[in-house]
Amino acid sequence: MVCSKGICGMADGSSIEWTDATWNPITGCTKITAGCDNCYAARFAERFRGVAGHPFEQGFDLTLRPARISQPLAWRRPRMIFVNSMSDLFHKEVPRPFINRVFDTMEAADWHIFQVLTKRSPLMRAYLKYRYADRTPPAHLWLGVSVEDCSSKIRIEHLRRSPAAVRFLSVEPIIGPVGPINLGGIHWVIAGGESGPGARPMHIDWARDIRNQCAERGVPFFFKQWGGIRPKSGGRDLDGREWNELPTTMGVHAA
């Protein structure tokens, strides 16, 4: 079952500007940083807590969805697929055998590009070092971490030391200045403001600083949104243009 443009399960098409589709073999999560305070996924899921038969009858409680594991194999046209837009694959309560099954599917469906994003960077790094200890990470698996301000930059270092063909940062929601970023071994940076009720404003200089660092290092930069209660109304221009750059470097391993 899918709902709201596939936010519950898998959807061919996404309102997220930097992907083509979403796939949620896991739903639900727990808040661990200030960047989670106004989580869109939790807000959506909790609306349906207690609604019998709804995919989010249990609200945003962590839930494994084994019936969805093979979904990407049925899509023959290549897509960029955001993995677990409604959860975190590396949540501490997700069993390693289940993570193995998700990776097995991603590796088998090598005509797609899979975008895996986490805030739990130590667990991601440990898993990737285990899985790719004696082989090259597939080029179609992109691994990323979320960063919201300068206090969360340790995740970038964990990512840089993880075996992956493409490593990316999602600096969203930007809730404070990030400061200098070590972009060695990073192939893509997404940035954007917070959206929805209670959204914290993003200062333009925070976004400019990230963009300028990317330009200096030749790292593709994607500006997703200004944010706010109605994020689409603010447009996506930063200094007079949209920034829609995508990764061009693949096959590069731990920095």
Describe the predicted segments one by one:
Residues 2-80, 88:
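N-terminal [4Fe-4S]-dependent radical SAM core
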Residues 42-45, 122, 165, 227:
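A very general structural signal that marks isolated residues within well-ordered alpha-helical segments
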Residues 1-31, 48-51, 161-164, 175, ...:
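Auxiliary Fe-S-binding modules of radical SAM enzymes
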Residues 36, 45, 116-118, 165, ...:
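Intrinsically disordered, low-complexity sequence elements enriched in Ser/Thr/Gly/Pro
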Residues 55-63, 96-98, 237-238, 243-244, ...:
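Non-transmembrane, interaction-prone segments in cytosolic or luminal domains
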Residues 64-220:
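Conserved AdoMet/S-adenosylmethionine-binding subsite of the radical SAM
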Residues 50, 57-60, 104, 127, ...:
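Short, surface-exposed, charged/polar-biased interaction segments
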